[in-house]
Amino acid sequence: MQSLTLEQEFKLKVYKENLKKLTLKQSQKHLVEVLKQMMLKDNIIKYLIRNSYF
């Protein structure tokens, strides 16, 4: 796994602090949404790789 940039580390810290303010149910819903977005991102990357012409 790659290291995070300083900017990414900062964003992650802010994200963690905001998560602490959520209830368990809100956190679970948020986790599912984030995972869905990551899967969509993976699909886009796979599509772009398959359809690239290098």
UniProtKB/Swiss-Prot annotation:
It comes from the Eukaryota. This is Uncharacterized protein ycf18. Belongs to the ycf18/nblA family. Transmembrane segments: none annotated. It is found in: Plastid, Chloroplast. Keywords: Chloroplast, Plastid. It comes from Cyanidium caldarium. The keyword Mitochondrion does not apply. GO terms for cellular component: chloroplast. The keyword Hydrolase does not apply.
